[in-house]
C-alpha cells in the first residue's frame, strides 16, 4: 500500500508524532511519501493545491493521510485518491479552525480522532468513530538517573529546572500563566521544549524537577505521557485526558489557572520529588487506552485498508 502523508511543513522539523507514525507504518511494510505544506492560514494552505495535484499525477498512491483539518481540507479538494484525516484537537477546539475541519470531515473518506470528544464537536455521530490516541515511542522515553541526565546536559545539580510543555510562542499553551507561577522560585531555569530531538527530550525530562502544563486546551498531550515514562513530576491544568493520565500517580498534580496555586504546589511538594521514584503504569490496558506509537499502527492500517476497498 502506497500512502501520501500531508502535513504542515512550516517548521524546520516535521511534527515528531507524524514522523514516528510514518516510521512505524514503513516498518509494517507500507510505502510512505510526504507532501509538506508551505504557508499559513486558509489561503496559504490552498496555495499548495496545484503542487499537490502535480504530486498525485507524478506518482500513484492508494491513499492520502492528512494530519489536521486544514491539511485535510486541501487533500479533499482532489478527487482521485481516497483521503483519511486525523484530527488532533486544536483543529476542532479552536474557533478559527473549526469550520474548515468540519467541511473537511464531510469530504474525506473517513476520519481518525485522537480523543473521544472530537467527533461530537464536529457533529459526527457514527456509532463507532475511529478513536486512536497519540502515542509515544517507549524505546525513546524511559527513566534514568537525574544526576546522570544533568551531567550529560551540563546542567547544575543545585539549581531548579522546570520544563514547559511546548514552545513559548504557542498561544494555546498559555506560557504567561507558567511564567507568572514560577517567577518567585529561586534559582529556577525555565526550559522551552522547542526544536529538540526526542532523545534530547528524554534527557531533559529525566533531568528536570517538574513538567509544567498550563494549556487552555488539550486532548491527550503526548508530553504528559512521555514525562510519566521518565518519572518526571507534573503539575497541569485540568485539560484533555490529563486527569485520567495522572490520577493516583505520585508527585503529579492538577492545578487551577491561578498562578499562586501552581507556585504553592511546586514549592510545597518540591522537597519530596526524587528522580528514582516509580510513577506507575503508563499503558492502561484495562481502559483500552493505547499510548505506544507501535501499538496504534495495527488499527490505523485496518482503517487504511477499509478506506481503499
Each predicted region: which residue ranges?
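Acidic anion/phosphate-binding donor-loop and adjacent secondary structure
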Residues: 95, 120, 136-152, 173
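Conserved donor-binding/catalytic core segment of Leloir-type glycosyltransferases
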Residues: 154-173, 179-182
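Aromatic "clamp/platform" in nucleotide-sugar-dependent glycosyltransferases that forms part
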Residues: 216
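Short alpha-helical donor nucleotide-sugar binding micro-motif in glycosyltransferases
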Residues: 105, 203-208
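Conserved acidic donor-binding segment of nucleotide-sugar-dependent glycosyltransferases
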Residues: 248-258
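Short hydrophobic beta-strand element within catalytic cores of glycosyltransferases
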Residues: 233-236
Amino acid at each position: 500500500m502506497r500512502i501520501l502523508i500531508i502535513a504542515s511543513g512550516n517548521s524546520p522539523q516535521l511534527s515528531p508524532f507524524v514522523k514516528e507514525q510514518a516510521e512505524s507504518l514503513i516498518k509494517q511494510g507500507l510505502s510512505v511519501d510526504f507532501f509538506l505544506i508551505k504557508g499559513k492560514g486558509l489561503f496559504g494552505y490552498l496555495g499548495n493545491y496545484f503542487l499537490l495535484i502535480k504530486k498525485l499525477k507524478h506518482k500513484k498512491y492508494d491513499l492520502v493521510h492528512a494530519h489536521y483539518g486544514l491539511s485535510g481540507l486541501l487533500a479533499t479538494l482532489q478527487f482521485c485518491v481516497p483521503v483519511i484525516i486525523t484530527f488532533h484537537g486544536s483543529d476542532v477546539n479552536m474557533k478559527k479552525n473549526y469550520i474548515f475541519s468540519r467541511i473537511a470531515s464531510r469530504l474525506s473518506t473517513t476520519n481518525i480522532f485522537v480523543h473521544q470528544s472530537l467527533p461530537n464537536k464536529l457533529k459526527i455521530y457514527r456509532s463507532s468513530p475511529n478513536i486512536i490516541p497519540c502515542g509515544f515511542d517507549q524505546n525513546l522515553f524511559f527513566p534514568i538517573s537525574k544526576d546522570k541526565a544533568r551531567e550529560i546536559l551540563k546542567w547544575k545539580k543545585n539549581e531548579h529546572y522546570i520544563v514547559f510543555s511546548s514552545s513559548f510562542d504557542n498561544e494555546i499553551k498559555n506560557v504567561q500563566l507558567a511564567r507568572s507561577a514560577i517567577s518567585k522560585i529561586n534559582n529556577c531555569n525555565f526550559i522551552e521544549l522547542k526544536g529538540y530531538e526526542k532523545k534530547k527530550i528524554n534527557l531533559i525530562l529525566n533531568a528536570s524537577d517538574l513538567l509544567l502544563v498550563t494549556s487552555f486546551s488539550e486532548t491527550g498531550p503526548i508530553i504528559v505521557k512521555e514525562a510519566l515514562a521518565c518519572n518526571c513530576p507534573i503539575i497541569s491544568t485540568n485539560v484533555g485526558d490529563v486527569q485520567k493520565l495522572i490520577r493516583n500517580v505520585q508527585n503529579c498534580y492538577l492545578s487551577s489557572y491561578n498562578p499562586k496555586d501552581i507556585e504553592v504546589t511546586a514549592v510545597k511538594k518540591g522537597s519530596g520529588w526524587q528522580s528514582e521514584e516509580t510513577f506507575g503504569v503508563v499503558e492502561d490496558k484495562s481502559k483500552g487506552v493505547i499510548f505506544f506509537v507501535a501499538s496504534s499502527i495495527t488499527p490505523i492500517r485496518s482503517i487504511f485498508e477499509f478506506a481503499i476497498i
